[in-house]
Amino acid sequence: MTNMNLKHKIFIMLLLVFCSSKIIAQQSQPNVLVFYVDDLRAELGCYGSKTAITPNIDKLATEGVQFNKAYVQQAICAPSRMSTLTGLRPETLGIYSIFTPLRSVHKDVVSVPQLFKENGYKTVSIGKVYHHGTDDKNQWTNYFTKEPNTYNKPENIALLEQFKKEGKKANGPAFENADVADEAYKDGRAAKYAVETLKKLKNDKFIMFVGFSKPHLPFNAPKKYWDLYDKNNFEIPERKKPENMYRLALTNWGELKGYHGIPNDVEYLDDNLTRDLIHGYHASISYVDAQVGKVMEALEALGLRKNTTVIFMSDHGYKIGEYGAWCKHSNEEIDVRVPLIVSRETSYKGRVAGKTSDALVENVDIFPTLVELCGLEGPKTDGKSILQVIDRPNTPWDQVATAVYARGKNIMGCTATDGEWRYTEWRDAKTQDILGAELYEHKNSLLSFKNLSGNTKYKKEEARMKGLLETQFPRNQGPFLQHDTPRN
């Protein structure tokens, strides 16, 4: 055999090995199913809620790893979702409001659907995934748009018709409990679309995002989910605000006040309306829980669970009367801490189930995690893969998680947590001058009622947390990047 023939044979053998390994790698790439829920704090049975009835999400937690200290990068829908889907923080993207679509500013940023589509995956978007439905619409091979809110009670339909005749741009009521089927409201339809799409894709490699709109306002859910709860059993949250908090730390919850029947000239809602809204929030959570159950049941029945990693997550937390406030829109612990459950495909030999982790993880970590999980080559991101924590929940991890919340274009709130303490600086967005600081202790509660910044007793804690904050937000970095489009 000549040297030339030997080299040729070796080349062919190496090529076959390479191609075979690539085929095996592609065959072992898991599918991904992501439940992306709107406005959901960790008000779930598996997270210790004494009130929420969530058997399907609780079951999912027993099948994977439940992260107790997961955080978003901004407590508002659009920037948070952009951060998840690009792996870039809001301060990197320069988008802090709901009025600026991602692609109106960033044409070349690589996103989750874009990367996975380029790598042969069927990419599916159902319901609210991005806040702006136009973002990356062409990167989804299957796209079911975010539907508008639905009202089913005749009196509410008539009310909206009246508003339309009068030329009023007004929202309907803040909650509804019509005695209708799940599909009469949009999240029931989202679950239906998800099940139908899974049947069509059972022989394909896919990544599917199912975006459930509840428990976002309005709290519209079928009556049977309201009937799970007795309104009078809900306790009224502590309404007092933290002592010495920064003047702009909380908003005036204008989002809720924009709904019909909500007074806009009061500091606090009365107990009766407060309980109605808390009731609606819980009914909406149980409604979403039932939809999660339907999709998971289909995943099992179709034989797809064995090769599908499932992620359950939220875009930010929420206040239902705590601090006398409502909705999100802050740097408070209750608004930036979120539920996160990850359950590996059942065929994975190293799969961990029924475990919790106190590792500090962030939604910005999801994209690089998916990249590693599926063996892809991804773009540079601000987040980092948490796959090793998913496989080994006690792995020592990050010391800090950070977030921002802008108050207009001139003031930026930047915040850091180590899982027990939260330190926030309110800065001039251009000069980085500190306008105010807050230090709160959260060892045992999402709520804290005294700003300890400047208290000599906690000088060491404040100095340490300030140092952690400045690792992400150095004072000498120059102005915060700003690409927000003015509201029309």
UniProtKB/Swiss-Prot annotation:
Gene3D superfamilies: Alkaline Phosphatase, subunit A
Metal-binding in keyword set: yes
Induction data: By ulvan and rhamnose.
Active site (UniProt): 77 (nucleophile), 131
Protein name: Ulvan-active sulfatase
Free-text comment on the cofactor: Binds 1 Ca(2+) ion per subunit.
UniProt source species: Formosa agariphila (strain DSM 15362 / KCTC 12365 / LMG 23005 / KMM 3901 / M-2Alg 35-1)
Keywords of the record: Calcium, Hydrolase, Metal-binding, Periplasm, Signal
Chain's role: Sulfatase involved in ulvan degradation. Ulvan is the main polysaccharide component of the Ulvales (green seaweed) cell wall. It is composed of disaccharide building blocks comprising 3-sulfated rhamnose (Rha3S) linked to D-glucuronic acid (GlcA), L-iduronic acid (IduA), or D-xylose (Xyl). The sulfatase is most active on ulvan polymers, particularly on xylose-rich ulvan. It can desulfate oligosaccharides containing the motif Rha3S-Xyl2S-Rha3S and thus likely proceeds in an endolytic mode of action, removing sulfates from xylose residues in periplasmic oligosaccharides.
Signal peptide region: 1-25
Entry comment on modification after translation: The conversion to 3-oxoalanine (also known as C-formylglycine, FGly), of a serine or cysteine residue in prokaryotes and of a cysteine residue in eukaryotes, is critical for catalytic activity. This post-translational modification is severely defective in multiple sulfatase deficiency (MSD).
